[in-house]
Amino acid sequence: MKGKDVEPMHSAIGSRKDFSNLDEDQLLAEYKACLEGILDHAQVMKLDLHTQHCNTSRLQHSVNVSYYSFLICRMFGWDYRSAARAGLLHDLYFYDWRVTKYLRSGHASWHPRVALDNAKKITELNKVEIDAIEKHMWPCTPVPPRYIESYVITFVDKACAVCEFAERKYVQIAESLMQKFRRSYAS
């Protein structure tokens, strides 16, 4: 469950965009529109009760992956709506993987299926979203992603995990890299 050191979500890691009011910024309003119907869903909000990486809640991690996947796909003209949605739902599971053991396979290859099943219960998913959620742990999952948006989520997920693990010590480095990214690519 959520540790006492987990801080409330105010923005995506490394971002200076204030998520407390998503409607005040044009880019954030566009991001929010992509997530209509799922961002405030009770099952998604429950992710805030679970720790993902060190002091990051699973909800914060999912928003991090969702937001940066949205930005990258938007920048290249890819399906940023599906990337934002799949990024938010890619870790929609409610067990502690450090405690729960699976007989079939390890957590890395099993939880994408659990997340996909849970996501299907709360919203309709398109083929890109299904692929991205199901294969976001590639190469731990045997089949590689089929769509470019799925690859974006796969790699953004890994980058966010590294930043979340290192956040306390190296937050300045992450912020510096994200500033350079924003100056170079984001509108």
Question: Language model features by range: what are they?
Answer:
Residues 1-187:
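Metal-dependent phosphohydrolase cores
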